[in-house]
Amino acid sequence: MTAGHRRAKHINHNLIEACALNGWAMGVGSQRRELTDPKAAFEWQHLRRDFPEVSLYSNLGIAQLITNPLSDIQRLTDALQANALIIHCNPLQECMQPEGTTHYKGCWQALADVVKNLPLPIIIKETGCGFSRETMMRLNEIGIAAIDVGGLGGTHWGRIEGHRATHDPIRQQAAITFQNWGIDTATSVRHAAELKPSFEIWGSGGVLNGLNAA
């Protein structure tokens, strides 16, 4: 997915059309803006209207899950007629963003509450740094439906924020320092499988060739 620019609607239409042809699901971009501006939902509503048969997943950051009531989360998923909710965990990116939200206290309770009370599968996703064994063990105890490990080696949002910080040399240097920080996708997938969890294991990004896969 993509969002926030003039070609986003066209690109997302092509992506969901590919999903419809191949029987794939599609996760939308972060719905954070919709929490304060319901009109922002227009960016995604045409996808559901034009492709009602595709499984569409809502998407929100864990910081917003902590600071917003469940009723607001439900409003986002209802507006999309979502089939699942992705909670993305991106602490490195948030630390690098000038506008980032770095409040994570209460995240475990917020996750447990949404799993218990929202009538949709909950998917937890990293954004380029992978998950540790300990984190995945705890997520398994909470009862999430799937983990997308989103490990090191693919798109790395910490690096992207460093490139955005053209007038902030401290953030640029921090992005360089952390550019290889994280657990690679293949290792995260292997660690998850060793837990024999109840959740599905998804691996996105960082598997670039047959050697990585092996």
Regions found by a protein language model. Name each.
Residues 4, 23, 27-29, 61, ...:
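Residue-identity detector for glycine
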